[in-house]
Curated annotation (Swiss-Prot):
The species this protein was found in: Lachnoclostridium phytofermentans (strain ATCC 700394 / DSM 18823 / ISDg) (Clostridium phytofermentans)
Subunit structure: Monomer.
Root EC class: ligase
Task performed by this protein: Catalyzes the attachment of glutamate to tRNA(Glu) in a two-step reaction: glutamate is first activated by ATP to form Glu-AMP and then transferred to the acceptor end of tRNA(Glu).
Higher taxonomy: Bacteria, Bacillati, Bacillota, Clostridia, Lachnospirales
Protein name: Glutamate--tRNA ligase
Cofactor stoichiometry and binding remark: Binds 1 zinc ion per subunit.
Presence of keyword ATP-binding: yes
Gene designation per UniProt: gltX
Motif ('KMSKS' region): 257-261
Names of required cofactors: Zn(2+)
Length: 490
């Protein structure tokens, strides 16, 4: 059996969409599961859509996610060039397009934009706008050899189109969807070489996949409709087709196609929203694939061992933000303290500017956050006591109200004034001693103090930890503010 070779072939048109990242991940996993090679190829044939700096984004993303390629523009192993514009300069695409013309499998088309406009027909709506398609009518197929040569000699702009049969059927096999057969009459004569001399995405893919000896091709199921055209190209050349693996659509929670407007459609969007790379990769692996085990948390190495592309689903995969947040939280909990602190510190510094123990604050929130952007809102009370309503002192479960909260604060204030060491254990000793002496429930003694020093309904850590971080002076100041608030309301 031939060595498994897969390729990730992105276009440098901006940030990497999660659908593209899933394709890269699946290509990587298929290759590595079988001990094969994972190739990076840059598809820049659509020159109008190129975005400056987008190639660097591709390199940065695959490096950060650990999807290290064995071959690519920076690692030529004899199958290069690995950038399509560089391959185009060698004349390879035009050479094979002309071979198809000679065999009657393709033809020159000289139709103007104006003529092509007349062939357009509406096919419904997409994103609120009417969608049109142009099905070519084979007009230029009927030009004589002399007419074609005269047009070429005159420098008339042209494209080269694939010549599809109008009768019969074409079948191909997909690893997920099985054998699919289409009527040839439904297939358009797609363009192979554009008027600028560049190949189309579809044609370049077939040529490059063949000469790079690609064995498995992963792509979104929106390409299922184009695959019969690829099949006919492979047959026309007498080449063996790769294994096709078409992945299900990724939708948002409303079951609509995940778009850039969602705000979390790209890898970089998710990083900016406080998600960690390992969690993103793990989550994206499960968008359409599931393990035979019930496990959901996988390292990249574990995914390589577990991944079996025959377990990819056909049905659309929902990008469930709640599940991603949960998974991210699990990864944060498992992070080693040094790496975690490196991620958490910039978020802590956004809201904590005073000389507090930031490492202690980071440790308090570690098991409570799902993304790093959750941190700021949880700890913003350290720098500045927020305005709060005294209704917060009334808590049915804790059996507290304004009156008994005021008494607790007035009673513990002198004890804290006398305390010199504001360690967690010292503060705990004072409060638990007071609770025991007065025969009250823990919540009755702790809730008023925590509320007073934080001004918040929920906090990372309790009264002991918060007061230890704030220190004596600030803790006492906040307790006195609370006493004044409660006294003036009664």
């Amino acid at each position: 059996m031939a060595k498994v070779r897969t390729r990730f072939a992105p276009s440098p048109t901006g940030r990497m969409h999660v659908g593209n990242l899933r394709t890269a991940l699946y290509e990587y996993l298929i290759a590595k599961h079988e001990g094969g090679d994972f190739i990076l190829r840059i598809e820049d044939t659509d020159q109008e859509r190129l975005v400056e700096g987008a190639t660097e984004i591709i390199y940065r993303t695959i490096a950060k996610t650990g999807l290290i390629h064995d071959e690519g523009p920076d690692k030529d192993k004899g199958f290069g060039p690995y950038v399509q514009s560089e391959r185009q300069a060698t004349g390879i695409y035009l050479k094979y397009a002309k071979e198809l013309v000679e065999n009657g499998e393709a033809y020159y088309c000289f139709c103007t934009k104006e003529r092509l406009e007349t062939l357009k027909s509406a096919v419904g709506e997409e994103d609120g706008e009417s969608k049109e398609i142009t099905k070519y009518d084979k007009h230029c197929l009927h030009l004589s050899k002399e007419e074609v040569e005269a047009n070429l000699a005159a420098g008339m702009p042209y494209v080269i189109r694939q010549n599809m049969p109008t009768e019969g059927t074409t079948s191909f096999t997909d690893a997920i969807y099985g054998t699919i057969t289409v009527e040839n009459s439904e297939l358009d004569d797609m363009i192979l070489i554009k008027s600028d001399g560049f190949p189309t995405y579809n044609f370049a893919n077939v040529i490059d996949d063949h000469f790079m000896e690609i064995t498995h091709v992963v792509r979104g199921n929106e390409y299922l409709s184009s695959t019969p055209k690829y099949t006919r190209l492979y047959k026309a050349f007498g080449w063996e087709e790769p294994v096709y693996i078409h992945c299900p659509l990724i939708t948002n929670e409303e079951h609509q196609k995940l778009s850039k407007r969602s705000g979390h459609s790209s890898f970089e969007d998710l990083i900016e929203q406080g998600f960690v790379t390992e969690a993103i990769v793990n989550f994206i692996a499960l968008l359409g694939w599931s393990s035979t085990t019930n496990e959901e948390i996988f390292s990249l190495e574990e995914l390589v061992r577990e991944f079996d592309y025959t377990h990819i689903n056909k049905s659309p995969s929902v990008f469930d933000m709640n599940k991603l947040r949960w998974m991210n939280g699990e990864y944060i909990k498992r992070m080693d303290s040094e790496k975690y602190y490196e991620y958490a510190l910039p978020q802590i510094k956004k809201v904590v500017t005073k000389d507090y123990d930031l490492k202690f604050i980071a440790d308090l929130v570690k098991t409570r956050i799902e993304t790093f952007l959750d941190i700021a809102e949880m700890i913003d009370f350290f720098d500045e006591l927020p305005e709060y309503d005294i209704a917060m002192y009334t808590h049915k479960k804790m059996k507290t109200d304004s009156e008994n909260s005021l008494k607790v604060l007035q009673d513990v204030l002198p004890r804290f004034e006398e305390l010199t060491c504001y360690s967690v254990s010292s503060i705990e000793s004072v409060l638990m001693g007071y609770i025991a002496e007065n025969g009250i429930k823990n919540g009755q003694g702790l809730w008023p103090v925590r509320t007073a020093v934080s001004g918040k309904q929920s906090t990372p850590g309790g009264a002991y930890e918060i007061m230890s971080i704030l220190g004596k002076e600030e803790s006492l100041r906040r307790i006195r503010i609370a006493i004044d608030k409660l006294s003036s309301s009664l």
